[in-house]
């Protein structure tokens, strides 16, 4: 008997590849414009997670049980090669380990050739020049594989690890086709988070600078009225999060959304997240709502890009195609054996769950880490908020990125980190996907993600575009199985963290026990009183009597 998730997965395929208007009933779905991934980053946690033991703040906070990815049954196991490797994290021996299996899925692997140019891919000179001005001289594997086929009019599924240039792989052919027939709305790009939507918008504007492209950003956290006006003016490209665009489709008139019925090209960026089904917080209903107003698949070109190719995504290539339409082109580059960049050094650091903050403080101050730009990932927004308060009180230059922050503050905080005004960014998984933050030298997993693919997205914030990077995971006594699952997924083991001349435990005992203990109490008091990072009371908050 097929599983519930596999049945839902087949419906997903129908929405994207066959007939968008034939949707399943969604009368009970009430999505606000903020129903995007960045509003759903409280990862599903079991009661045994070290996250629940880390600090008193988290143990008192409300717990949301949300999943970031589908948990497959045995029949639904993704066709992704896994390699069993010996873990160097101390643990009890386990009999059941994953066997290494190499699964051939017939995907097209674009060869790497340092001599290939964009001009050789039939990219127009104005685009070649624009890319050159952005220091993009030669195509990456995913770009070399996908751009020529998209220009031929083929639907495309592109899978490649983080930092491999997937945005350019779809932006360049879209802009070249648009320049030949510049009407609006020519293309729609759907992506899970506001920050990623903004980044894609900026890249479209930069690449199209020689032309008069009109692009519009449609995301939550902003007034809907100016967005509706912008849509009514028929821009050339719309970059949107599914929740907010679905709100416009439900509430706006035909004069606002009518131009979407003529869209020539649609992109699902981070398609694995957009098409994930069977979990609370799924974006699939909103994605279906957005697709329902577009031309049917036979009359549009559909492009799916992701760093993790899930069964829902891969199944699309096997759907019946319209007579006369070219078959779906599938290009997977570095999605299996090289899911983690070879220039990334993965390490683990075993810490007691009762003193993780103490170890984090001293770890950030070691001689090698002090000059680095650092992203710290937490599983929950409450933990991220708490660490931001604590690290500021400990005189670290820190800022935050999570779903509880207002949109304007999220943009400002990300800008501060990119401009090096803040050395440390404390974030939830809202920052794990797609964001290109230059020169991140170190990623810290303060909490271990339950899904190994989320780990891949997190550590992909460093070691981008061939640069070197480090990722250190703080491991508690209950995290060992999670680490082993990650090692099996990426096919590489984590080394124990070490730095010459540094005994972290000794430094914690000598220098941080009293100080961090005091600052922890101050941080929790600030949060209890509703104060922002920096001590200012939030608007609308009254002083506690």
Curated annotation (Swiss-Prot):
Pfam family, one: DEAD
Enzyme Commission number(s) of this protein: 3.6.4.13
Reaction(s) this enzyme catalyzes, per UniProt: ATP + H2O = ADP + phosphate + H(+)
Biased composition (Acidic residues): 33-56
Binding residues for ATP: 160-167
Compartment(s) of residence: Nucleus, Nucleolus
Chain ranges of the Helicase C-terminal domain: 359-510
Compositional bias annotation for Polar residues: 1-11
Motif Q motif location, chain numbering: 116-144
Xref: PANTHER family: ATP-DEPENDENT RNA HELICASE, ATP-DEPENDENT RNA HELICASE RHLE-RELATED
Protein name in the entry: ATP-dependent RNA helicase dbp8
